[in-house]
Amino acid sequence: MKKSLNNSSMWDVKPIKLSILVPTRDTVHSHFAYCLTQLVRTTSEAGIDTYLFFDSNTILLNQREKLIEKAKEVRSDYVLWLDSDMMFPSTTALRLLEHNKDIVACNYMKRAKPLKTVAYTDLTNWDSWVPLEPKDELIKVEGVGMGCMLMKLNTFDKLQKPYFEFTYKEDSQDWYGEDFNLLKKLRDLGYDVLIDTILSMDIKHLVIYAFGSEN
């Protein structure tokens, strides 16, 4: 196992195989590309067997299903979901792995006003979003976006396909995304969905903004 400044005793116990899964369109943000290269380098130098899979398509449900199958093919222990419009520290995977939890994610801001985050403690109440505030302990939520989420691959073992679905909420006349639906299935199986609020402070959500005369 390669030694580096990023090495830790936790990696000496058992080599870990990590698949980084990224659903994309035709292009990715340059800031994301830079963060990703630094993350892969840092994670690999820590002795973790690191794989990177992209799926460039137009149907997000298909992308996520195919990416999980790629992770299974290489027999990953963990998967790190990243969206291609995110910025994150090079140590992101290491810091999430250190928790040794089934599901641990980062909270981050949505890309539209009113400014809210993507994590909720109660999926029946859209006002229950979790503010970006650092806490000493991991916090439990009912739902969070998958822009930066680490999962043990074996959490999928008890699930039936399709893993990812959209569902319509009649009461609020809107949709649950594939992220919230997956996490609900896993919560129903007894898994906790946890947020690293300290790491979340370093996560950015990229958007293209058009400057014009009104600015």
Regions found by a protein language model. Name each.
Residues 1-57, 62:
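N-proximal low-complexity "stem/linker" segments adjacent to membrane-targeting elements
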Residues 2-15, 158-215:
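C-terminal catalytic/acceptor-binding lobe
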Residues 35-38, 66, 95, 181:
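Alpha-helical elements of Rossmann-like donor-binding domains used by nucleotide-donor carbohydrate transfer enzymes
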Residues 44, 97, 187:
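Anion (oxyanion) recognition and catalysis
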Residues 65-78:
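Active-site nucleotide-sugar/metal-binding loop of Leloir-type enzymes
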Residues 68, 89-167:
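Conserved catalytic core of nucleotide-sugar-dependent glycosyltransferases
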Residues 76-87:
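Short beta-strand-to-loop acidic/aromatic patch adjacent to the donor-nucleotide binding site
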